[in-house]
From Swiss-Prot:
Organism: Ruthia magnifica subsp. Calyptogena magnifica
Subcellular location: Cytoplasm
Active site: 75, 215
Annotated site, Could be important to modulate the pK values of the two catalytic cysteine residues, chain positions: 157, 206
Entry protein name: Diaminopimelate epimerase
Gene expressing this chain: dapF
Length: 271
């Protein structure tokens, strides 16, 4: 089957976008992993599908697959690309665009400067929402010898405070944490260096994709954790390897993610 796709990225976090409103396209995990291969396929961090939703007052269903072919709950940078895609392809004139994910409903706001602001919803610190096997909720947890905060932004995140993100062995530490028995579903692991109360440096190792140039939900998780610990203020610029994103969060409220999106190319591929 020959399908149309668009390659997009948000701060280097890249995606294969597919219009599946007709519902006639299906992928298996092997196909997705092959397409995600950066040498033999298209190359991407996530595959994003635009599908119809049966939920009242919802415009689309937003389906997300990691590069390993497994479906996941949320992707913040992908949500920004999703909004831009459905708008530029003429699939919706709404603003905001309301989409349904595996973890709930989110609102996507298109700005005049080609950036998108995403209402990522209310974060959760409940270990059950993170699938963290601990007896009770705490401000931090010791996992594989590391002190970590844990937050759900619709998907599970652990956050580690570090002095310098450039000297951290991100891959080996993240893999060690992800393999912990306390995280049977794994988690995205963020390494946060606080520069001041309104700026952080951040690197994120995503489950199923490895370290990415940017992770929107990871930036949200890091800032939420920092605000909750009194280390950060309500508006924070997160500096990631792919660029900067703005996170807004007031304790007890929703968290918002803003940043640019970019079309890269479009084409057809046989699956």
């Amino acid at each position: 089957m020959l399908i149309n796709f668009v390659k997009m990225h948000g701060l280097g976090n890249d995606f294969m976008m597919v219009d599946n409103l007709a519902g006639d396209i299906t992928f298996n995990a092997e196909q997705i992993a092959n397409l995600a291969n950066r040498h033999l396929g298209i190359g991407f961090d996530q595959l994003l599908l635009v599908e119809t939703s049966n939920t009242k007052n919802v415009d689309f269903r937003y389906v997300i697959y990691n590069a390993d072919g497994l479906e996941v709950e949320q992707c913040g940078n992908g949500a920004r690309c999703f909004a831009f895609f459905v708008s530029k392809k003429g699939l919706s004139n709404n603003n905001p665009i309301v989409v349904e994910t595996r973890s709930g409903i989110i609102n996507l706001y298109l700005n005049d400067d080609n950036t998108v602001r995403v209402d990522m919803g209310k974060p959760s610190f409940n270990p059950a929402d993170i699938l963290l096997l601990v007896p009770q909720q705490s401000t931090y947890y010791q996992i594989e010898g590391f002190d970590l905060g844990a937050v759900s932004i619709g998907n599970p995140h652990c956050v580690m405070l570090v002095e310098d993100v450039n000297t951290v062995d991100v891959s080996s530490i993240a893999l060690r944490i992800q393999q912990s028995e306390l995280l049977p579903n794994q988690a995205n692991i963020g390494f946060m260096q606080i520069l001041n109360t309104h700026e952080i440096n951040l690197r994120v190792y995503e489950r199923g994709s490895g370290e990415t140039l940017a992770c929107g939900s990871g930036a949200c998780a890091a800032v939420v954790y920092g605000v909750e610990q009194g280390l950060l203020k309500e508006n924070v610029v997160a500096h990631l390897n792919g660029g900067d994103t703005l996170i807004e969060y007031i304790q007890g409220g929703h968290v918002f993610l803003s940043g640019p999106v970019q079309f890269v190319f479009e084409g057809k591929v046989e699956i």
